[in-house]
């Protein structure tokens, strides 16, 4: 029977049953028979597991600098770039980067540059001078990377400057943890949602008012904190107000008088410090004594032991001194004896010569006497 709401409508047959027709299924042109292709040894058939391939390329990204060719060169061709556990969000073309995104991009580029420099350092075809330059570049890059890591922009600038994808991933991980824990929480009532929304709106209003008063540019706040040496805005304002109070006209005369008296005192101190020629000589002697004391600092610790040793060896030194004096006297006496021996040798030589001459004269005279005696005896 037709629905009562369709009564009194034209074109409806009320005396016939309701029929719901469906189109017939078309005949399938395909057959269940598949002709197996003959095996060809020239065709390599690889057995690839979809799950293993998905795990391998799950975190891979493709950029404009990829190169899937098999060219041979000094640099390796880049294919799919797997970031690993560190996921960084890159902004689109024309969009403005946040400071954290700039820092992350610089870290990635520095890591790539360090890898390239390390590959060039290992290369044997590169000259030693180029390797030294690469070492200097690697040192500079590592220092800059340490500086970037020490900045900790996410902690300094807050969550407003961090990319939104990290917050989304953190929320997803929290949801997964809640699912695994199985702890159920009650859905908040609409009244609590409205109260939380009102609280958030009031906080946003207060933040906007603070941004209007202080400014939303972090570089200005950093300059203010650097100038006042404080991170509290009220303390900075008080510091600036005290400085502004000092610049008032009624206090400038007092400041000028104090500066004049201070300048006079500084001149007097400078005159006293200059001194006369005697003071200069005294300072020079003091400086020399100080230099001598600085040079003898390494010997100061050994000096008491040396003095004790010298005192212990004092008697031995005296005996050695006396022995040296005795040896000197003996050498002197030996010298005099040697000279006297030389003189005695000369005298002996002269005596021997005179004795030989006298002996010859005596022999000649004795011969003459014998001749005379013989002549006399023959004459008788």
Swiss-Prot record:
Name of one Pfam family that matches: Dynamitin
Question: Keyword Cytoplasm, does the record have it?
Answer: yes
Which of UniProt's keywords are assigned here?
A: Coiled coil, Cytoplasm, Cytoskeleton, Dynein, Membrane, Microtubule, Phosphoprotein
Q: Name one GO cellular component term.
A: dynactin complex
The family note in this entry says: Belongs to the dynactin subunit 2 family.
The UniProt function text for this chain reads: Modulates cytoplasmic dynein binding to an organelle, and plays a role in prometaphase chromosome alignment and spindle organization during mitosis. May play a role in synapse formation during brain development.
Q: What is this protein called?
A: Dynactin subunit 2
Source species of the chain: Drosophila melanogaster (Fruit fly)
